[in-house]
Amino acid sequence: MEASGERAAVVRRLMEVKEESGKTFSEIAAETGLTNVYVAQLLRRQAHLKADTVPALRAALPTLTDELVQLMMQPPFRSYNPDIVQEPAIYRLNEAVMHFGESIKEIINEEFGDGIMSAIDFYCSVDKVQGADGKDRVVVTFDGKYLPYTEQKSEHMMSRPTRKTS
């Protein structure tokens, strides 16, 4: 587990590498075949860099050091600073999910049944589009695998010892 100070120092270094490249998250994403949000997650140490992605990321970010690559390839300690919820853009995203969440849940249940959207087998992207009025609009896409809740039958519980009956 990374200490928060150590993680912050690594994130600062990674963001400096991005800054030196002069590229946006979306430009790096286009060069690496990743989503723009996943690139941001990698550079914020919220995602695990896979070995087969290293060459493309190195090409996109030429000043990325071996040391940083090695750190990025370690499973991260995924967390967030609770104070970040106060940041206006994050606050509004949270507000939107809370406001629309109950309706979204109902539609998931109607379309799929009793279950949830995975945040593990999950893709996320942020895109800029022009609205009908010609003004810029933000499109946030959450693309998660559907996971049905299971009926908990004891016969399917593999960790439960088999009971012998007399």
From Swiss-Prot:
It comes from the Eukaryota. Keywords: Lyase. It is an enzyme of class 4 (lyase). GO terms for molecular function: cyanate hydratase activity; DNA binding; identical protein binding. InterPro entries: Cro/C1-type_HTH, Cyanase, Cyanate_lyase_C, Cyanate_lyase_C_sf, Lambda_DNA-bd_dom_sf. The keyword Transcription does not apply. It catalyses: cyanate + hydrogencarbonate + 3 H(+) = NH4(+) + 2 CO2. It holds the Pfam family Cyanate_lyase. SUPFAM superfamilies: Cyanase C-terminal domain (SSF55234), lambda repressor-like DNA-binding domains (SSF47413). One of its GO terms (biological process) is response to salt stress. The keyword Lyase applies. The active site is at R92, E95, S118. Its EC number is 4.2.1.104. NCBIfam families: cynS. Belongs to the cyanase family. Catalyzes the reaction of cyanate with bicarbonate to produce ammonia and carbon dioxide. This is Cyanate hydratase. It comes from Sorghum bicolor (Sorghum). The lineage of its organism: Eukaryota, Viridiplantae, Streptophyta, Embryophyta, Tracheophyta.
